[in-house]
Amino acid sequence: MLENLEKYKIILASNSPRRKELLSGLGIKYEVKTLPGIEETYPDTLKAEEIPLYIACEKAAAYRNTMHPDELIITADTIVWLDGVVMGKPHNEDDARQMLWKLSGKTHQVITGVCLTTVGAQRSFSAVTEVTFAELSDEEIDYYIRVYKPMDKAGSYGIQEWIGFIGVRGISGSYFNVMGLPVQRLYTELKKL
């Protein structure tokens, strides 16, 4: 379906198993290539929707000096936004527990920024999904952290895991965005290249 991409060697610049799964779901052939030590920092003046977009584009910038003319680099970043606060990946189990307590019984936003970069051009976009959690008990939170170890997930949860089944009361927007890659929007943007 995406014949226009045949001229590119597609590089997914992410170790996220969820992003790999989602990109594979589009039927796109790609390689994974990551660079160590890319800082995920941003200016304090950015709005919520700008933060993951800024970080995704900064990740892409790290590849500019090593890109080949036939490469298309896909970079992404996801944050959880609640009450004016960014929730990234937890630092430890206590941090994960605090995040899940804060999300319990509330609606938050999951925002993913995606950057598509070639030697000659760059296209970027972000997607926002609202997620409403039911009230979670301490036992449910502790069980989830102990069994699923969500240390690699923004907001300390994976919607596709147990906590999503028992705790997510509703979503508005892309389910796949909550997993880490808004694949429908990505497909649309890739068709434009």
UniProtKB/Swiss-Prot annotation:
Its EC number is 3.6.1.9. Nucleoside triphosphate pyrophosphatase that hydrolyzes dTTP and UTP. May have a dual role in cell division arrest and in preventing the incorporation of modified nucleotides into cellular nucleic acids. Belongs to the Maf family. YhdE subfamily. It is found in: Cytoplasm. It holds the Pfam family Maf. One of its GO terms (cellular component) is cytoplasm. Keywords: Cytoplasm, Hydrolase, Nucleotide metabolism. This is dTTP/UTP pyrophosphatase. GO terms for biological process: nucleotide metabolic process. HAMAP family: Maf. Its main location: cytoplasm. The keyword Hydrolase applies. Its cofactor is a divalent metal cation. The record marks R18, T78, Q160 as: Important for substrate specificity. SUPFAM superfamilies: ITPase-like. The keyword Hydrolase applies. GO terms for molecular function: dTTP diphosphatase activity; UTP diphosphatase activity. It is an enzyme of class 3 (hydrolase). The active site is at D77. It catalyses: dTTP + H2O = dTMP + diphosphate + H(+); UTP + H2O = UMP + diphosphate + H(+).
